[in-house]
Regions:
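Hydrophobic alpha-helical topogenic segments used for membrane insertion/localization
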Residues: 200-226
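SDR active-site lid
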Residues: 69-162
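Residue(s) in the substrate-gating loop at a strand-loop-helix junction
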Residues: 36
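A short helix-coil junction within the Rossmann-fold of NAD(P)-dependent oxidoreductases
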Residues: 17-27
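Active-site helix of classical SDR
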Residues: 15, 52
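Active-site Tyr-X3-Lys motif and surrounding loop/helix of classical short-chain dehydrogenase/reductase
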Residues: 1-5
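Active-site loop immediately N-terminal to the catalytic Tyr-X3-Lys motif
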Residues: 43-48
Length: 256
């Protein structure tokens, strides 16, 4: 209940206050809510958190449609981060009796912040930060009957931090913690860039890159068809390691 008061009702109340303000503002504005990749794909151990983020997604989508019906010039965006380099696991209430972590890939906090700022000036309905999380969510959406047994088997072990037996003396469920941390300090690798988010923010550039790659592939295919197998065999011969050695001399050396 406490988690929902913060994760869900905090978003609801904040969004409604923002909508009232932006209705009266000339030019409207943007409401950007932060969901999670777990808005799309629930996982064990984090069931209540997943449920709260599903609720955030449902409310955000409904709010967008209600504002559309009103004709309000208010864009509503949902940002869905994957695993992020925050002290999330330190500050959450941990009932497992084990040290926990977010599985890789983990992204830096500024990657999410930059995406939120982009949504403030570029209306985007929904955007995911982190390709790994998007892959998991797509897999769950396409094959839930296959995904759920796999998640049940492997997700808890992937979230366990075997490098540390550390357990928090306090958590942030009811009161703020006093460790002063805004980033986790133990992740061996933190990604500073999300290609998936950049593609979503700049679809024209992404389409151009795909077109260039498709053109190169087509040109290669046409060249092969025009030159025929003779040219192809010549290229293979140049890069055939068997032709780079003296087979007779090698056989003699082995016999000796």
């Amino acid at each position: 209940r406490r988690l929902f008061e913060t994760n869900y009702w905090g978003v609801v109340n904040g969004s409604l206050v923002a909508a009232d303000h932006l209705r009266e503002r000339e030019g409207g504005g943007a409401i950007i809510n932060v969901g999670s990749i777990l808005s799309d794909a629930p996982i064990p151990v984090q069931g209540v958190y997943s449920a709260s983020k599903h609720a955030v997604k449902g409310f955000t989508n409904a709010l967008r449609m209600e504002l559309m019906r009103e004709g309000a010039t208010i864009a509503v965006s949902l940002v869905k981060p994957g695993a992020i380099d925050t002290p999330y696991n330190r500050h959450a209430r941990n009932l497992t009796g084990q040290a926990m972590q977010n599985p890789q890939p983990v992204y830096a906090t500024h990657v999410v912040a930059d995406t939120i700022l982009y949504c403030a000036s570029h209306p985007i309905r929904e955007i995911t930060v982190g390709g790994g999380g998007r892959l998991i969510a797509s897999f769950y959406s396409a094959l839930p009957g296959v995904a759920e047994p796999l998640f049940a088997r492997f997700a808890p072990s992937l979230m366990r931090d075997r490098r540390s037996a550390w357990q928090p003396d306090e958590d942030g469920l009811y009161d703020p913690t006093e460790d002063g941390l805004d980033e986790e300090v133990y992740y061996p690798m933190v990604r500073q860039f999300s290609a998936l988010a950049e593609v979503r923010k700049h679809p024209g550039i992404a389409a151009g890159v795909v077109a260039v790659l498709a053109g190169v592939g087509l040109a290669t295919l046409l060249l092969n068809q025009r030159t025929g197998p003779t040219r192809l065999e010549t290229l293979r011969g140049r890069f055939n390691p068997r032709e780079w050695m003296d087979a007779t001399g090698l056989r003699t050396h082995i016999d000796d």
